[in-house]
Amino acid sequence: MVETLLSGIVLGLIPITLVGLFVTAYLQYRRGDQLDI
C-alpha cells in the first residue's frame, strides 16, 4: 500500500519537476536575450 502511494507520488512529481526546470531555463534564456539587446 505504501509502495504504491510512494510510486504514485514520484510519478506525479517527475513531470512537475521537469516542467519547472524547463520553465526556469526558458525564463533565464529570455532574460539573457533581453540583456544582450
Swiss-Prot record:
It is a single-pass membrane protein. One of its GO terms (molecular function) is electron transporter, transferring electrons within cytochrome b6/f complex of photosystem II activity. It comes from the Eukaryota. Its main location: plastid. It is found in: Plastid, Chloroplast thylakoid membrane. Keywords: Chloroplast, Electron transport, Membrane, Photosynthesis, Plastid, Thylakoid, Transmembrane, Transmembrane helix, Transport. The chain crosses the membrane at residues 5-25. One of its GO terms (biological process) is photosynthesis. One of its GO terms (cellular component) is cytochrome b6f complex. InterPro entries: Cyt_6/f_cplx_su5 (IPR003683), Cyt_6/f_cplx_su5_sf (IPR036099). The 4 large subunits of the cytochrome b6-f complex are cytochrome b6, subunit IV (17 kDa polypeptide, PetD), cytochrome f and the Rieske protein, while the 4 small subunits are PetG, PetL, PetM and PetN. The complex functions as a dimer. Component of the cytochrome b6-f complex, which mediates electron transfer between photosystem II (PSII) and photosystem I (PSI), cyclic electron flow around PSI, and state transitions. PetG is required for either the stability or assembly of the cytochrome b6-f complex. Belongs to the PetG family. This is Cytochrome b6-f complex subunit 5. It comes from Welwitschia mirabilis (Tree tumbo). The lineage of its organism: Eukaryota, Viridiplantae, Streptophyta, Embryophyta, Tracheophyta.
